Amino acid sequence: MGLDQWAFRVKNKAVLNRFEYNQDYEHKQFFYWRKNRYVQNWMEKLYQSLGGKDEFNLKILQLLPEDIDKLEEDTKSGKIKEYNKSGFFFGDQPFEYQEYDSIMRFCRMAREEFKRDNAVFYDSWY
């Protein structure tokens, strides 16, 4: 048990809004994290800033290029470490190189999806 997180892509034309897409279109996972609470808490704050009111569990969130830019900026500057809210399912590992590296790889991969005319969504479950 614990926090599982992934990013998936769908065609841009499938997007209905920042929180849903037309499920008649195929989606494909392209990135996975396990218990990266920094990413989860960062995404939850973005979700809330966009009007999300429910618990941020099993909620999808479309990420735009500017969101990826901000995530990368916050990671490079170390601000991501401020999102250190722990939880029973979130683990307690410190922010180390592997967390940094996984976020940077994700940002690169998300940008590749944008170039392919795909939308990027984040999802998580705990």
Q: Can you describe what each PLM-predicted range is?
A:
Residues 1-126:
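Acidic (Asp/Glu-rich) sequence patches and key acidic residues
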